[in-house]
């Protein structure tokens, strides 16, 4: 066997191994993407009913009220007095007697109401029942119904625990903070005006204003039927005085004085809630930290060791101290699934970290904290919201994970809180089956102001869905004892409309859902049609026709939401990707960002499929028609019948906003689905449809921005990501043609090189360079001989052709929009070649240039072939949606990439030997990796990835603005530093191998 044959066999085997490795990487990439689709069983609520609306009965006047003393009765009687404030001067004079038994069971709020002529009597075994009777009587009068219709026995509420957030208490409605619409922080900044940076730490005037907010919120919530509240905060109220081995905060540390000031300031808030029969639960993420506490954990436990019970005892002791100091506090609500910068309060060093990530950590936390709660007669509400975090990432939706984490934890002080949807608060999701299991006390989470459905700025009647869900869950799990309704919270506070509960904007729209949730908690079979009519009568009109029209509009609202904000053929599926379950609303990335990235839109099209594209498009039209009918319902009402003309205007304006938005979204869905079809089929008709839909969308988007930019009540949606996607798509066809032309030229260069090796064509100008590149790239051991005797032109072409082709190919691959990508790629290649050139020294550099350049041409041909179909959009479409094509492409691309370095080393080995040639290559690779990674590290990995992704449009644009790409993909921020370090190691090894070694000779004579 000749040397050339042996080398050829080695080369073939090497290439086959590289292709196999590349195929393995391709398969691994597919597994990492983890895109799987299965059927999803969505909820099946009844169709909304419309109550028969009768004329209101005259409002009575209560001239004599005999009720027990106490804050709860005072507040209830104030509500009744307010409900009868519009009674006519000649209204019927009514007397009310209220009696309450001595029982102290807060769960028993049963009562009996009797009417005897002009005398009404409420009797109840408990104070809670008697107070409820007064509130129900007030609601009956507000609804325009006769007190006689309320007569009879009313049993205790089905669910005794009914909690709310704190609404918008302490939040200042400043339009200038909402107008930009780009602040995606989840911090409400409640009580911001109350806090001072220095002693006394509290602004008393602002505190008084906040207390007025609190009083109104408490009275409203109690009147609706709620009896618990989740108050944000914990770590700012404690000083960890009992921490073993402490102190956490040394004497004189401002954290100690600030905690005392905050406790003193907010104690009256908590006490007032207790006076009105409302339990107060502190609400915190875990781990809740300060720099000092983090240092304490590091010194004592070596870090935040969340599986160590002693760490959790530090928190338990702090809670015990707080409960002893503030007896109005009843427990704590804990979340472990979200944290990070968007949850941290500006100006404070209190923050939270995603550190509770294992089963043992969760169980240890709950064991310690519930033991403390049992001893202090308080409760721990544990939210199962874990959203992909660590080993407990799917605990919130997966029964097996739920059982593994919580299965045998047994404590009467533990309440487990879970969202009713199998995921976040989206439509189309199945019921959360983890709520049907377990022996723990359970509460169900609802959200009134649906953050993913336009932040409550569109009418959105959730009542039938909540009723169906609660009915199903109660039938399956008798341990469910309550609900938690989010009246305002959830999502970013200042990236949507400035609708603040009881304060600003059209908050009455989502207050409707808060009422319905309370009604269902008391009676899961409540007549929601009547609840809706009562809501409409209280806020908008006493006219039966107007009330009926409003109820009809609300009944249509879900069709507009479910079809307009979702793509039904996709939303009805359950999708998994990257180990998570993307929401059914992927094309709207978190709240108001219309996404334009290829990963999302291409996968959406692939799951919908070409056979259901028209169905998905039709859904947008159905939604738009529903919104237009809703507007007609309201428009046809008599303006004179409305209590407040401004509320009628608000209703019409919000429907105009919804119609405008849904029309824009309908055009966008048609646009990107047509584009996906073109990438999928190459159909000219699909491309033409995309062009028409694009023009329609652009016109609607411009009109939308013109109409709503700067409108804090109806903010313009964030269309930046969508526009970036359009900018790229506009170039696809041009880039595809450019790629085809370059592909022909590259193939011509390749063919010339192949033919020149055996024909007289080699004598033509440039042919020798093509021949050298072909031979050196396929048989690098012949690189030196193939470059001998070349003319200056051929030597230039050896550099210019591969280099120019690489520049052009990579530029086309990025649609000429990502200079960051080009800088990284070209910078790395130039660094590699520069180091190799220095290493080669006085020897001819053309063998290695020919070898690397020839492989670069082959690698560019592969990319140009992929781009030649429908441009970069088609390239990425195939990557995201075609597993076989993805594996084949990665296998070939990887093999050629590595072969470039193998060929470089092999070519130089003919000049300096195998060891030194290997050192040259490693030194070049190490230098390129180290310097490129160092540059990324200096810029910051998150910032670099954000800029790169903005230009390439591969992942959701909003990801970087909200959680961060590194956080979402769990990429450590230190990664580029480690890569730079690895590059230095490779460089050092390469330099060592590259040095000329001389054997020692023994010069001693023997």
Range-by-range predicted roles:
Residues 1-18:
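N-terminal Sec-pathway targeting helices
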Residues 18-119, 125, 146-152:
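Acidic, contiguous N-terminal accessory segments
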Residues 36, 42, 178-180, 184-185, ...:
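C-terminal non-catalytic alpha-helical accessory regions
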Residues 63, 76-79, 107-110, 116-316, ...:
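Feature activates predominantly on carbohydrate-active enzymes
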Residues 85, 167, 227, 256, ...:
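Catalytic-core regions of glycoside hydrolase
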Residues 734-757, 981-989:
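Selective detector of the "anchor" transmembrane alpha-helix that sits immediately C-terminal
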Residues 772-859:
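Selected alpha-helical membrane-embedding segments in polytopic membrane proteins
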Residues 836-973:
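Hydrophobic alpha-helical transmembrane segments and adjacent short intramembrane/lumenal linkers
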């Amino acid at each position: 066997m000749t040397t050339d044959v042996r080398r050829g066999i080695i080369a073939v085997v090497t290439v086959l191994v590289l292709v196999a490795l590349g195929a393995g990487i391709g398969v691994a990439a597919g597994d990492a993407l983890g895109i799987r689709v299965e059927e999803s069983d969505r909820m099946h609520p009844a169709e909304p009913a419309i109550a028969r609306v009768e004329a209101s009965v005259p409002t009575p006047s209560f001239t004599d009220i005999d009720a027990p003393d106490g804050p709860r009765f005072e507040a209830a009687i104030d509500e009744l007095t307010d409900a009868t404030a519009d009674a006519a001067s000649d209204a019927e004079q009514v007397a009310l007697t209220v009696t309450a038994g001595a029982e102290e069971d807060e769960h028993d709020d049963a009562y009996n109401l009797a009417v005897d002529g002009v005398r009404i009597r409420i009797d109840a075994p408990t104070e809670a029942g008697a107070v409820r009777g007064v509130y129900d009587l007030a609601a009956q009068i507000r609804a325009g119904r006769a007190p006689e219709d309320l007569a009879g026995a009313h049993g205790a509420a089905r669910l005794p625990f009914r909690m709310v957030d704190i609404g918008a208490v302490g939040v200042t409605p400043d339009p200038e903070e909402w107008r930009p619409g780009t602040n995606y922080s989840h911090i409400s900044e409640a009580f911001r005006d109350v806090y001072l940076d220095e002693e006394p730490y509290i602004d008393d005037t602002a505190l008084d204003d906040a207390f007025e907010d609190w009083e109104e919120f408490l009275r409203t919530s109690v009147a609706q039927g709620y009896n618990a509240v989740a108050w944000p905060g914990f770590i700012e109220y404690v000083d960890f005085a009992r921490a073993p081995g402490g102190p956490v905060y040394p004497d004189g540390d401002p954290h100690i004085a600030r905690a005392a000031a905050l406790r003193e300031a907010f104690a009256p808030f908590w006490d007032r809630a207790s006076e009105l029969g409302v339990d107060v639960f502190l609400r915190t993420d875990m781990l809740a930290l300060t720099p000092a506490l983090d240092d304490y954990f590091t010194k004592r436990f070596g870090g935040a060791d969340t599986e160590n019970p002693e760490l959790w005892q530090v928190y338990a002791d702090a809670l015990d101290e707080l409960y002893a100091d503030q007896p109005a506090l009843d427990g704590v609500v804990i979340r472990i699934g979200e944290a990070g910068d968007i949850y941290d309060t500006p100006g404070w060093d209190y923050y939270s970290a995603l550190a509770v990530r294992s089963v043992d950590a969760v169980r240890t936390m709950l064991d310690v904290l519930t033991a403390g709660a049992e001893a202090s007669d308080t409760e721990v509400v544990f939210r199962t919201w874990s959203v992909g975090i660590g080993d407990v990432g799917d605990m919130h939706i997966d029964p097996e994970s739920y059982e593994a984490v919580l299965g045998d934890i047994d404590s009467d002080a533990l309440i487990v809180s879970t969202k009713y949807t199998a995921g976040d608060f989206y439509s189309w999701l199945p019921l959360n089956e983890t709520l049907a299991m377990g022996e723990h006390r359970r509460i169900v989470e609802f959200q009134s102001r649906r953050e993913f459905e336009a932040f409550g700025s569109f009418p959105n009647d959730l009542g039938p869905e909540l009723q169906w869900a609660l009915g199903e869950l109660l039938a399956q799990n008798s341990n469910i004892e309550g609900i938690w309704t989010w009246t305002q919270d959830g999502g970013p506070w200042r990236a949507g409309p400035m609708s603040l509960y009881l304060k600003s904007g059209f908050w009455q729209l989502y207050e409707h859902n808060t009422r319905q949730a309370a009604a269902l908690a008391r009676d899961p079979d409540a007549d929601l049609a009547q609840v809706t009519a009562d809501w409409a009568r209280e806020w908008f009109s006493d006219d039966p026709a107007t009330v009926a029209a409003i109820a009809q509009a609300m009944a249509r609202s879900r069709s507009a939401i479910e079809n307009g904000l979702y793509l039904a053929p996709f939303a009805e599926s359950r999708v998994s990707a990257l180990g998570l379950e993307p929401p059914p609303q992927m094309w709207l990335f978190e709240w108001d960002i219309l996404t334009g990235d290829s990963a999302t839109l291409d996968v959406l099209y692939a799951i919908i499929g070409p056979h259901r594209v028209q169905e998905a498009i039709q859904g947008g039209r159905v939604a738009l028609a529903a919104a237009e009918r809703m507007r007609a319902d309201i428009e046809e009402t008599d303006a004179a019948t409305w209590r407040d003309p401004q509320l009628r205007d608000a209703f019409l304006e919000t429907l105009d906003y919804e119609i405008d938005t849904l029309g824009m979204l309908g055009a966008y869905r048609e646009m990107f689905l047509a584009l996906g079809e073109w990438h999928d089929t190459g159909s000219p008709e699909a491309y033409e449809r995309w062009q028409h839909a694009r023009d329609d969308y652009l016109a609607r988007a411009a009109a939308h921005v013109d109409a709503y930019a700067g409108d804090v009540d109806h903010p313009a949606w964030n269309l930046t990501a969508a526009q970036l996607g359009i900018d790229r798509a506009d170039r696809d066809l041009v880039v595809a043609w450019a790629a085809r032309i370059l592909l022909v030229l590259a193939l011509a260069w390749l063919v010339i090189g192949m033919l020149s090796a055996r024909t007289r064509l080699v004598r033509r100008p440039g042919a020798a360079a093509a021949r050298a590149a072909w031979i050196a790239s396929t048989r690098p051991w012949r690189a030196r001989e193939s470059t001998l005797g070349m003319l200056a032109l051929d030597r230039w072409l050896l550099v210019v052709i591969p280099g120019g082709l690489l520049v052009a190919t990579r530029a086309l691959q990025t649609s000429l929009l990502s200079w960051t990508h080009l800088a990284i790629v070209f910078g790395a290649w130039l660094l590699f070649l520069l180091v190799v050139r220095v290493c080669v020294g006085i020897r001819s550099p053309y063998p290695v240039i020919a070898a690397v350049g020839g492989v670069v041409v082959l690698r560019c041909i592969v990319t140009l072939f992929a781009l030649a179909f429908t441009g970069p959009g088609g390239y990425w479409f195939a990557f995201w949606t075609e597993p076989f094509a993805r594996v084949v492409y990665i296998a070939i691309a990887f093999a050629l990439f590595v072969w470039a370095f193998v060929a470089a080393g092999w070519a130089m080995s003919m000049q300096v030997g195998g060891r030194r040639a290997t050192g040259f290559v490693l030194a070049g690779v190490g230098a390129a990796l180290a310097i490129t990674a160092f540059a990324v590290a200096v810029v910051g990995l998150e910032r670099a990835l954000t800029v790169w992704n903005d230009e390439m449009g591969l992942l959701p644009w909003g990801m970087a603005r909200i959680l961060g790409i590194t956080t979402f993909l769990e990429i450590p921020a230190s990664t580029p530093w480690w890569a730079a370090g690895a590059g230095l190691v490779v460089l050092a090894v390469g330099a060592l191998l590259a040095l000329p070694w001389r054997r020692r000779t023994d010069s001693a004579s023997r």
